[in-house]
């Protein structure tokens, strides 16, 4: 009886030593693994969006969510992104698409005009967040503008 008690006590001690020698994974380490998986999924989603946006016009590449500030600064320097360059690009684009051309004040004239503008656009929209929610939609826009009339311009008397 004494021998059996001694052996069972020895087994219990060995089991406790064995369990304490292999600690369970802490919450922090499993949380870090989850964050890495989320980061990878976010990168993949960003790359999918970038591949799908080939037809869009961008002034510069936006920084990714998980890039360090140093990487963002390097990209900003490489692409020469300054306020002046952004304003120049906006002005160039507005001049390119602007429909109004001003004439000098000394010019006189009169006449008729007609204006006809059509616009069609088709695209898709994708959205995803960190909780795994996603939304996808397609859109189509058709627009037609027209006008006609008479004009007179020049110095008024």
UniProtKB/Swiss-Prot annotation:
Residues 124-157 are annotated as: Disordered. Residues 1-21 form the signal peptide. Residues 128-138 have a biased composition (Basic and acidic residues). One of its GO terms (biological process) is effector-mediated induction of cell cycle reactivation in host. Keywords: Host cytoplasm, Host nucleus, Secreted, Signal. Disulfide bonds: none annotated. GO terms for cellular component: extracellular region; host cell cytoplasm; host cell nucleus. It is found in: Secreted; Host cytoplasm; Host nucleus. Effector protein involved in the induction of tumors in infected plant tissues by the fungus. Required for the reactivation of plant DNA synthesis, which is crucial for tumor progression in leaf cells. Interferes with the MAPK-triggered phosphorylation of maize SGT1 at a monocot-specific phosphorylation site, resulting in both modulation of immune responses and reactivation of DNA synthesis during leaf tumor formation. Interacts with a maize homolog of SGT1, a factor acting in cell cycle progression in yeast Saccharomyces cerevisiae and an important component of plant and human innate immunity. This is Secreted effector protein See1. It comes from Mycosarcoma maydis (Corn smut fungus).
């Amino acid at each position: 009886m004494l021998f059996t008690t001694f052996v069972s006590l020895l087994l219990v001690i060995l089991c406790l030593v064995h369990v304490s020698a292999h600690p369970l994974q802490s919450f922090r380490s499993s949380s870090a693994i989850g964050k890495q998986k989320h980061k990878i999924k976010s990168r993949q989603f960003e790359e999918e969006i970038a591949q799908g946006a080939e037809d869009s016009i961008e002034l510069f590449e936006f920084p990714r969510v998980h890039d360090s500030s140093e990487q963002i600064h390097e990209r900003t320097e490489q692409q020469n992104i300054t306020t002046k360059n952004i304003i120049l690009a906006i002005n160039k684009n507005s001049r390119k698409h602007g429909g109004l051309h001003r004439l000098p004040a000394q010019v006189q004239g009169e006449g008729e005009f007609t204006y006809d503008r059509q616009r069609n656009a088709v695209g898709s929209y994708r959205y995803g967040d960190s909780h795994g929610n996603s939304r996808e939609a397609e859109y189509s826009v058709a627009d037609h503008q027209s006008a006609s009339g008479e004009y007179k311009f020049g110095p008024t008397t």
